[in-house]
């Protein structure tokens, strides 16, 4: 890839990421049109804790594939959520909760990391970058596999957070008494912070503004949209590449 093209792709990703994170609720003034873009902007204008991850991600999928039928996708998400719910009780520990998620998503559901990715870890099959593609093929990459955890956590009010790293994303379960990193690309195995520090060359510093920190739902979607923008660009959808 020529240096100029690589620079543009990186710039495009950061436009998505920084625009979403730094503007916060700055999507005010949404037009009355019911377009997918405006519906997504309306969702992102909500308080971060009120954002419905499922609705946002399905809208992003519909923007890629307007003929998408979301009913079977919502049905699958409901099945996964209910299966996790049945394994939990009010007394479930952090480890038991993480094990329930791992069991349902990977062992029962069969969701795994796709082996068809580019040097950045982005799926070569563009559908597998989106929620709908992962739910159909049961193959995804670090971002949407993590998003599956976060959707279930959102529905069950579990203390799950997305965590961004350079060219990677994982899930963290965190309360006052427990902190567990969940690696969705390796069937939900848990790793200490030191594993990620060594592999990705970053320090888990509480003072860091983005990388290694627990992200809210708006920030998580911002990180995801950076990848979506690159996929639109690579597939010559330039009008969609800048949201």
Regions found by a protein language model. Name each.
Residues 2, 19-22, 219-222:
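Intrinsically disordered/low-complexity terminal segments and short unstructured peptides
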Residues 2-13:
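Bacterial N-terminal signal peptides that target proteins for export
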Residues 5-6, 23-26:
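Intrinsically disordered, low-complexity repeat segments enriched in small/polar residues
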Residues 11-24:
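Bacterial N-terminal signal peptides
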Residues 26-243:
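A structural boundary/capping signal
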């Amino acid at each position: 890839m020529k240096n100029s093209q690589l620079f543009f792709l990186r710039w495009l990703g950061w436009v998505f990421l920084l625009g979403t994170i730094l503007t916060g609720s700055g999507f005010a003034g949404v037009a009355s049109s019911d377009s997918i873009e405006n519906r997504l902007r309306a969702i992102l204008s909500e308080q971060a804790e009120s954002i419905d991850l499922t609705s946002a991600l399905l809208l992003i999928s519909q923007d890629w594939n307007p003929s998408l039928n979301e009913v079977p996708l919502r049905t699958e998400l409901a099945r996964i959520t209910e299966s996790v719910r049945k394994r939990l009780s009010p007394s479930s520990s952090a480890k038991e909760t993480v094990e329930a998620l791992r069991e349902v998503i990977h062992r029962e559901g069969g969701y795994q990391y796709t082996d068809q990715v580019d040097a950045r870890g982005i799926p070569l099959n563009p559908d597998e970058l989106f929620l709908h593609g992962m739910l159909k093929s049961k193959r995804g990459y670090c971002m949407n596999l993590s998003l599956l955890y976060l959707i279930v956590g959102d529905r069950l009010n579990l203390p799950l957070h997305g965590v961004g790293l350079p060219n990677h994303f994982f899930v963290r379960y965190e309360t006052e008494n427990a902190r567990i990193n969940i690696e969705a690309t390796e069937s939900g195995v848990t790793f200490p912070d030191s594993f990620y520090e060594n592999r990705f060359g970053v320090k888990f510093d509480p003072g860091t503004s983005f990388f290694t920190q627990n992200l809210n739902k708006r920030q998580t979607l911002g990180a995801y949209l950076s990848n979506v923008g690159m996929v639109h660009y690579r597939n010559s959808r330039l009008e969609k590449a800048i949201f």
